[in-house]
């Protein structure tokens, strides 16, 4: 066994020792006796490299989720609560996201002087304290890795809640009128909307020519100026997208663009409106910076 593994090969009889090495590679054990015998460090990285050389693991295998105790996605049966929905399907709602995204979670629309920001309404499925709620709390957020996405919630919920996957989508809609520096005529409702999904690149091309997006862009610039006048700071840090496709690593610059800045500012506006709503209705909420 020792000779086999030292020579970067193994047989079926060696599998118990290989399993011990795998436990070290995945951070489930701190020590495998055989590693000391063949002069390999008892560390996850050294054990992982050995398993690659033995061709026990494929080079595309990502050990990091297992090392950190992050389980694979689990499917949990879900059904949507029956809630009275405000019909906003007459509005053109735009979900701007990466070209390869299929789980848009925000969209925007214009209704006269009123702006609507729509958020995927997971609350219609995930009740406080439910099995799904506890599952999501344990995961905290989606984990985006180059080779996979480990979801905070079962992927079946994405199919129900993601904006634009169906002809109409349920949403939590935040409506307001921006009058000078004031947010007025605030509404927060459960709604149903009709969504047009559009990539950042395509949105950049029509920001000026699309009547709705041009109006939103004007209000976004006014709100950004209001924040700047009140001492806000904007940090422009380099960002990249790292993806693993067809056995190749792809690294691309995530350059800033007008549509990305528009989406970011709309989320800030949504946060401000929700904070005002919570304040007016004595709702206790965390404050995030």
Where are these regions (language model features)?
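Electropositive polyanion-binding surfaces
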Residues: 2-30, 34-39, 49, 67-68, ...
């Amino acid at each position: 066994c020792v000779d086999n593994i030292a020579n970067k090969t193994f047989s079926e009889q060696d599998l118990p020792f290989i399993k011990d090495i795998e436990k070290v590679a995945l951070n489930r054990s701190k020590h495998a006796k055989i590693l000391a015998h063949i002069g390999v460090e008892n560390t996850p990285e050294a054990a992982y490299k050995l398993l690659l050389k033995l061709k026990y693991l494929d080079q595309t295998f990502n050990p990091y989720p297992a090392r950190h105790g992050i389980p694979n996605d689990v499917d949990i049966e879900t059904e949507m609560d029956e809630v009275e929905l405000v019909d906003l399907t007459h509005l053109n709602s735009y979900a701007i996201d990466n070209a390869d995204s299929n789980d848009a979670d925000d969209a925007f629309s214009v209704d006269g002087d009123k702006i609507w920001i729509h958020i995927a309404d997971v609350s219609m499925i995930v009740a406080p304290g439910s099995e799904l709620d506890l599952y999501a709390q344990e995961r905290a957020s989606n984990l985006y890795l180059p080779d996979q996405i480990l979801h905070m919630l079962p992927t079946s919920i994405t199919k129900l809640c993601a904006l634009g996957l169906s002809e109409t989508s349920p949403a939590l809609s935040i409506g307001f009128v921006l009058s000078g520096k004031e947010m007025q005529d605030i509404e927060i409702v459960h709604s149903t909307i009709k969504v047009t999904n559009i990539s950042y690149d395509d949105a950049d091309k029509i920001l000026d020519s699309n009547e709705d997006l041009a109006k939103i862009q004007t209000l976004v610039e006014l709100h950004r100026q209001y924040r700047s006048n009140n001492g806000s700071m904007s940090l422009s840090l380099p960002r990249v997208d790292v993806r693993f496709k067809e056995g190749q690593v792809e690294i691309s610059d995530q350059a800033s663009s007008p549509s990305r800045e528009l989406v970011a500012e709309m989320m800030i506006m949504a946060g401000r409106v929700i904070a005002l709503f919570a304040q007016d209705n004595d709702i206790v909420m965390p404050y995030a910076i």
